[in-house]
Each structure stands twice: as structure tokens, then as C-alpha cells.
Amino acid sequence: MLTVYTQSDQALSWIERHGHCPPVFVCVLGFTETGLIPGISAAGKTPADRKLTAIADAEFLIKGTTAGATYPLPPLISGVSPVFITKALVDALHTPVYLFNSGLPIPPAVPVINLDGQPARCLSTGQALPLALVEHLFQQGLQWGAQLAQEHAESYLVLSECVVGGTTTALGVLLGLGIDAGGKVNSSHPHCNHQQKLALVRQSLEHHSPHLNAMEVVAAVGDPMQMVVAGMAIAASHSTGVMLAGGTQMLAVYALIQALTRQQNLAVDFSRLVVGTTKWVCEDASGDTVGLANLLAPVSLLAPQLSFSSSVYPQLQVYEQGFVKEGVGAGAMAIAAHLYKNWGQEQLLELIENLITRELGQVKEKKQQ
């Protein structure tokens, strides 16, 4: 049910140490105007939809229904939001949920912890965020990471994100840090739009020195989520386990952690950090997530072998065709459910389908064998 794609010894050690513990779910919400570029993301049909994706996902994660929602889940190009996966599993596990607003255009209609950030400008400007704000968000991450680890000493932290356009800002950060990530990132499209992403990133980085430090890279081409999660992971690793919940975006955060600890002489326990995502990310032939993880060695990359091929819902089946793939910590929560409760394919799929049945009002019919 669980595949370790890189650094298996480190991953197995992490699982032995933390896998039996209940998870605590953290989602850092953010926004970048990069997500408004036509064709950049499939996480919302139109730019107007994509502006509300994180806000709607947050509301659904807490309320569990779009009935009467202030911000209903926007239509996707195909499929349903990965928040359905996450919501089904955090509810079934009774997992504590913390939502952080690192920089949204409007506040969600549910309680969130406001970090006094702001949305990022499009990375094509080369001036995505003020440097002082990047430093502030990093300090907020350090403080909250330490606090959450202390408050949940018998758990581990699942640190997730919701940032539309975030794989493009992730590519920007990776290239800005000198990591040869071109052609290796993923997207919510079935076939990754590498050329579009690379052109945007190169346009922005050509205005800068090739020797930017980690903070300066995020200020140039990043998004507000990245420094918050990096800070949280660094601080929490001193006392508990951390699963960075996502593919490309969390590998970029891992690269930031490596750079920050090197440049600022910060202590971090890398043995307590793993990256958890979905098989749809790891096995996406139009990217190379495993190759990217190997560039950042020694990072452990894990994914559940959750499959939607037998689902009665076409909205889930399209995940097997490469749509959506990941988001809002979906892969990591499936890993957590498997490790903590030993739930396998059948239990996980049933929980997710039951939520869709309740939400979409569709009667679930078993497929004919």
C-alpha cells in the first residue's frame, strides 16, 4: 500500500519512529498571481476560479459541504478537488486541523490563523514578495512549528499547502537555488506545461544575480506558503516527526530548508523529515519527481498506492489519467491513515467515495465484476 521511492532506509526509520503516532494536519494557504496566467494550472477552470481555490478548499475542509458555502468549490477542468481525499481522512481519523493564511486575496469564511502575509505578485516580475515579508513569514513558521510540536508531542505534523500556481513558483525557487529542476516538476495538467513554466521563471531570474540567498530567491520568484512551511519544518524537527505533504511544491520547500540551514547555520534534524505525496505525482511520466528528489538527497519520498481505477465516480477515475494528482495534503493523509490505522485500498476508497456521495448527492453503485 505504501511505496518508498527514495532513501528507503531513512524512510523506514521515520516510519518506525513516527508511523504509529496520530497525525496533526496543518495546511498553509497562500496565493500567487502566477496562478492567474491562462493555462498555468488546472486547479480551477478560469483565472477567476483559481483566485478562490484555496479559500474554497479551506471552507470545505472545515465544513465538509458546499451547501450554503460562502465560497463553493470551483469547477476544475476535470475531476474533483483533492480536498475530498483529505477531508474524508482527517474526519475518519479525528485529526486536529490547523489552517494558516500566509497570504490570500480575501480571507476564508472559516477560522484561520492569520500570519500577516500577502499574496505574491506574478513571478514573471522578479519581485514576487518584499524581502522583509519573506523574513517575517519564516519567523512565523519557526514560532508555529515549535509551538505545534510542543502541543502535540505524541503526534507528528503533516505540513500541507494550497497554492494555485505553486508548482511554477516551486520551479522558480528550485532553479533560483541552483538546482537543475527543468523538466522534473509536475502540474495539475495531465501533461506538464514545462515550457510555459520555464519561460516564466527564466524571464524573472534573468533580472537577478545568480548568487541569491534562499530568502532572496523566494522574494524574487516564490510564494508566501514556502517560507512558512520551511520554518515550521525546521523548528518542529527538533522534537517531532514532520511529513512535508506534497510533491514538487514540498520538494522545493525541502530545498529551501537545506539552503536556509546552510546559509543561516540553523539546526534541523533531517532524519525527522520525509516528503509524502501521491503515486499520481511520483509516477507522472510528464515530470520526474523521483529524479528531483534524488537531486536533493537525502530526502525520503513516499506515496500510497491508492488507486481510483475501480471508483464508481468519473471525478475520481480521472486521477488515473493524470488530472489533479495532489493538493491539500491528500497523499500524506492517505499515508497517515495507512500507517496509523493500517487502512488499505478498500477502506480508503470507501471513505472518499462516501464523502462524495454525501456531498454530490450521487448514489454510489458498485461496478459489475
UniProtKB/Swiss-Prot annotation:
Gene Ontology MF term list: nicotinate-nucleotide-dimethylbenzimidazole phosphoribosyltransferase activity
Family: Belongs to the UPF0284 family.
UniProt cross-references to PANTHER family, sorted A to Z: PTHR38811, UPF0284 PROTEIN SLL1500 (PTHR38811:SF1)
Protein's recorded name: UPF0284 protein sll1500
Parts of the chain that traverse the membrane: none
